[in-house]
Amino acid sequence: MKILLFICGEGLGHTSRCLALGKEFLAAGHEVSFGAYGYSRELVRKTGYSAWEIQPEIRLIGETGIFDIGKSIKETLRNLSPVGFRKLLKLIEVLEPDVVLSDGYYSGILAARSRKVPVYFIGHQFNMEEFFQKKGPLLAVAGKLVRRFYNYIFSSVDGIMVPDYPLPYSVNRRNFTIPRALNPNIFFSGPLIRSRYREVEAKAFRHPNVLSTIGAFGYRAAIFRKVLEAAKLDPDIHYTFIAGPGIVPEQFPEIPENVEFTGFTDNPFPYYRGSDLVITAGGHGTIMESLAFGLPVLSFPDEKHTEQENNATVLEDAGYGKRMSYLTRPEVILACIREVLEDENYRRKTRRLMELAEVLDGPAAVRKLLEEKFGERSAGKENSKEET
């Protein structure tokens, strides 16, 4: 079976789960191609795979922790071009995939449909109209147009893969609004994680160890500064900071002795395995990785980023962690860290999610689904080529 994976480059979560799928398909003897751009393409190549360059699509803009939908729309429209779309069509013609998997990359879906190739949408956010609400009449109209577009996308694909725990455990459940008629096409795969818990050797840290990740946005440096201040208040709690592509360690002077600043890593899983708690933004990918490794989460969602705020709310409501704020003071951050570390109920619930992730084995579940649907089709294509 020949699989083409298109990757949205906004946030590393899309890339990480596509790498998990690519690893699974390749191990099973299938042929995999990646289409990506920006630092997502760089990460694919650092992992050891080749990646075709595709045009950028969605671009998220924000300052000081506040998501700006207006600027994001302008940047997204600036990225799109007919030339880039024609390159997608040509890429599909050259690679001749049996199926296209498009993770948050809508142009890839349109190109696959145009070439009559089966295509699946991978995503966790299904209520984008919320981003446009209460922001004036023009953005309200834009939101309705966006809703019509993504409803068309959801109804035109061969299936929708949700890289989350099935209900009632799903973290994205507040972002999940799809017409009931599409239910037969929806598949909750479980977390798509590159490394399974039992396969990872833990980093050797002093405990308790708090792992802080910043993702891909430089403006989230505010989280680091607040957490650094919290770290100074209790030297008995140890911290490991993993920076994103937009952050350099030199931005943070006077790092206390109980803090290790590692810079960016393309393999965070030993850090998860060796830690007791994760501090992150509200991105779905990092939250899934944390929960799949049994870790409670303190989530700092970007303000006005509805999807992230919903994720963080579910974390708190379900007892998997706490929803934080960029306004939270260091003293309160420390109080929340202590509460989550000391209250066994948090760890008990997230440990259950770790066990569930192992049972679900998201990448294998997706592979088996596609093998059942397209395995025979792929074999038929090869036989046809040999006969000609």
UniProtKB/Swiss-Prot annotation:
Query: What protein am I looking at?
Result: Uncharacterized glycosyltransferase MA_0453
Task: Give the family, as the similarity comment puts it.
Answer: Belongs to the glycosyltransferase 28 family.
Identify the PANTHER family for this entry.
GLYCOSYLTRANSFERASE, UDP-N-ACETYLGLUCOSAMINE--N-ACETYLMURAMYL-(PENTAPEPTIDE) PYROPHOSPHORYL-UNDECAPRENOL N-ACETYLGLUCOSAMINE TRANSFERASE 1
Q: Which Pfam families match?
A: Glyco_tran_28_C, Glyco_trans_1_3
The source's superkingdom equals Archaea
Q: What is its EC number?
A: 2.4.-.-
What sort of enzyme, by top EC class, is this?
A: transferase
Q: Which InterPro entries match?
A: Glyco_trans_28_C
Disulfide bond residue pairs: none
Keyword Transport appears in the UniProt entry: no
The record's keywords, sorted A to Z, are: Glycosyltransferase, Transferase
Indicate the segments annotated as coiled coil, or none if absent: none
In the record, what terms sit under GO molecular function?
Answer: glycosyltransferase activity; hexosyltransferase activity
**UniProt source species:** Methanosarcina acetivorans (strain ATCC 35395 / DSM 2834 / JCM 12185 / C2A)
What is the phylogenetic placement of the source species in the record?
A: Archaea, Methanobacteriati, Methanobacteriota, Stenosarchaea group, Methanomicrobia
